[in-house]
Amino acid sequence: MTRQIDFAGQSGVLYRYKALEEMRPVPPGGANFVYVKWDGDAPKIVYAGETDSLHRSVFETWDEAQSGYGATEIFARLNITGVVRRAEHDDIVAQHQPPMNTGGESLAGRRKTGRTGG
């Protein structure tokens, strides 16, 4: 059974993310991804990223997310079109205010697209 989670954006749109462990090998294409920690049964996003190459970017800040923010899982959603990825990213960040995204980003994913603001 595929592990999926729906995350709502600030707009009210639901985005369905799939557990990265079920996407092996990690796809090379564009995607949105989130690092998650669990609060009981509720997933909490600690970082939201978007990239034009999931396999190249998704693990760049994973160690920091685990050690500094308690992240335990990665979920991803494949999105080929950059404008769609960026809009989804902004919607998710606006709703969930992930701690690794607030106060300015210097992290993976967004750096790959040349976007540095949150």
Question: Can you say where each PLM-predicted feature lies in the sequence?
Answer:
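Coupling/hinge elements of helicase-like and P-loop NTPase modules
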Residues: 98-109
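GIY-YIG nuclease catalytic motif and its immediate N-terminal context
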Residues: 1-57, 83-95, 111-118
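N-proximal short alpha-helices
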Residues: 27, 61-65, 109
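Short, compact, well-ordered microdomains
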Residues: 58-61, 66-99
